[in-house]
Amino acid sequence: MKTKEEHIGHWVNQSIDDWEAAELLFKGRKYLHSLFFAHLSLEKVCKAHWIRANESNIPPKTHNLIFLLSNTAIELTNEQKEFLLELNRFQIEGRYPEQISKLFKISTHTFAEEKLAQAKKQQEWLLNKLQ
């Protein structure tokens, strides 16, 4: 049976792997997909925080970053909340064909580069908070 720290480590490692995928997708000019994986990376580090803050080692099956962090000791600024809400779109809306065309239009190189930089900053901040 895994310890709480082993569960947290699993989610952290998955977050790092997904971040590498986001970077590769960006380099391959798959901007929408890179933002999907950036969200996935943040989701997994948020789940690590959720495990740390809760009795259970199994986080809720949700993709909502703010919901996951609302059940932890992490305090977000309004700016962070706005960014995480925006990033949530790429996980939820990015799954459905009727929404994908809208997201493709806004997912330019410049847009994705800016959002990935913000996401990386959030990922590093959240990873540091786990230590």
What are these regions (language model features)?
Residues 1-131:
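Terminal alpha-helical segments
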